[in-house]
Amino acid sequence: MSSLSTKTDLLGDPDFIRLQSVEVDGSEVIPGETRPRRNTKFPKLTNSPDGKTFTLYDVYRINKDSDSNFLGIRELLADGKRGDYKWISYKQACIRANNIGSALVQLGLNKGDRIGIFSINRPEWVLSDMAAMNHSLVPVALYATLGANAIEYVVNHSEISVLLCEGKNVEKILSMPGTTIKTIVSYDPLPQATLDKFKDNENVKLYLLSDFEKLGEQNPAQHEVPSPEDLCTLLYTSGSTGNPKGVMLTHTNMVSEVAGANFSPAGVIPEDVHMSYLPLAHSFERAVVSLMCYVGGQIGFFSGLIPELFNDIQVLRPTFLCGAPRVWQRLHDKLWFTVNNDSWLKKFLFNWGLNSKQSALRLGSTTPIWDKLVFSKTKDRLGGRVKFILSGSAPLDPKLAEFLRACFCCPVVSGYGLSENVGGASVAYPEDNNVGHVGPPLSACEMKLIDVPEMNYFSTDKPCPRGEVCIRGFNVFKGYFKDPEKTKEDLKEDGWFHTGDIGRWNENGTLSIIDRKKNIFKLSQGEYVAAEYLESVFVRSPFASQVFVYGDSLNSFLVGVVVPDFEVVQKLFASKYPELDVSNHATLAKSKELYKEILSSFDACAAEAKLHGFEKLKHIYVEHEPFTEENNLLTPSFKPKRPQLKERYQTIIDTLYAEYKRDHPDV
């Protein structure tokens, strides 16, 4: 196969790839901890991308006179379909943001006051954020899929008086008469029924955005320029327990993240195009959008429906893509589904090409002939211009990363971060052909590991230290809004943020996220179980789309809830079990055949991952309805809400345990 493979230099700086982070010179040796590590290329932490940009206000103003495309959305055609992207320039955006900001001042808002933004990603979201920066206001983002109770909590907790939102959310706010909101600005025209409700509402004033911009244009206000340490935004975490926490991020936090990303492999140039679909209420997407603003790139927004995302991608043709592992897993599954429905010859060529290319990539080679014969078509699924894929929010399966890298002809890098550090603390370098890690620290922060003895993770582990990941630097948050106790718990006086994630320093100075401190539980025999890791193993099954693993200290074994990948199931079962009605998901989920196939595939996954016996699922419930944000079982970053999952399936879990104990009295 040498004729199909060409050796190329993918290692960049070989010395750096061999050692990507180093211990901080002069740092104290503390028992139970590793010494702090920084990016080898940045022994001094950075808080600005250029030494003169220190606030998000500065970031938004850099390209204020540019006529280049900035914000784009697909035009809605007369027949209800979506057309091409329609753009506004940086100059146009700054003019509109000036008007919106002046109108906010006209309402009596002052520096430090909070405003709300309640919308899916769209140009008006960014314009509202820009307007807030012009006058040192503090935007508070509400998730489009938050429940009424959470929305009301965030609004009142942050004392929002003015809310800018898309039209469909206006009714939701009106149904909450006890909030602090005094003014609503709707991005969209409203039906007469909604307008009539405002006639009788003396407590809340309504503006349409077009009228609001005219108000500001007629009453221009001087900018109130923020300082680097001023509060820039409140990001309420989508956490899986209790009320959301308000993460206080300063301008220094936001801009140092721009610097860290700009100096990283995720750095972009003015010619780059970003597809914005991850929630702007999430710190990661805010950071990416801020980075694009800094370099003067283009930001295209999805049409609002995740099922249409890949159609939007093919129209926009972005130059890089960001997403969570669940997005990439679905892309993987859909591609395999297409391959398995092709002719035997195309299937044979795809498998041959995939195996050959993956082997070549591990050796630092490329396969131009295979790319032309097979993978040019798969690359076109993402628009044909994607130069790298960035995965975050959860660990990416190394096998999935290799698959994506081969099929889409670009590096696939994993990043790591939380809301408390603006979504990014580390990111892998595309020149590093190793997978299964999240790279070295960004230039804005340093990281260390501390012992977690109850899980047998120690900073003295050989050959690689392991422990809880702690982060300190310019991108680490100021604290939780109105919650000093939680702040003291997670953010120590010496500036170290304790993440609750378990990491491992690899020999080349990269970090791997291997576990989660807060999502472990002990079985009755004393064995600890890491639920998230096991879920990542079992979801490798071709039959599984989503998996919820459950265990507790009263039982010696695990049970689970599984949402099948019905596309795969229908294809395989149509020939193997012709007597089953594969078109009815609810009926199919109850079939013994599917139950047995899933458990059998889980056993294979467990064997491949070398799981212990107590880590295997003994009994499962097959659920035909997926876990989603809408049914409150997923966070906006696609992480499972474990307490809500437990509450929803508690009766089923109890039944699973009772049935298995009945049939296996010796457990």
Curated annotation (Swiss-Prot):
Q: What is its EC number?
A: 6.2.1.3
Q: Write out the catalysed reaction.
A: a long-chain fatty acid + ATP + CoA = a long-chain fatty acyl-CoA + AMP + diphosphate
Under SUPFAM superfamilies, the record lists: Acetyl-CoA synthetase-like
Enzyme class (EC, first level): ligase
- Which terms does the record give in the GO molecular function aspect? ATP binding; long-chain fatty acid-CoA ligase activity
An individual GO BP term: fatty acid metabolic process
GO-annotated cellular components: cytoplasm; cytoplasmic side of endosome membrane; endoplasmic reticulum; lipid droplet; membrane; phagocytic vesicle
Query: What does the record give as the function of this protein?
Result: Long chain fatty acid acyl-CoA synthetases catalyze the formation of a thiester bond between a free fatty acid and coenzyme A during fatty acid metabolic process. May mediate fatty acid retrieval from the lumen of endosomes into the cytoplasm.
- Return the protein name: Fatty acyl-CoA synthetase A
Supply the source organism for this entry.
Dictyostelium discoideum (Social amoeba)
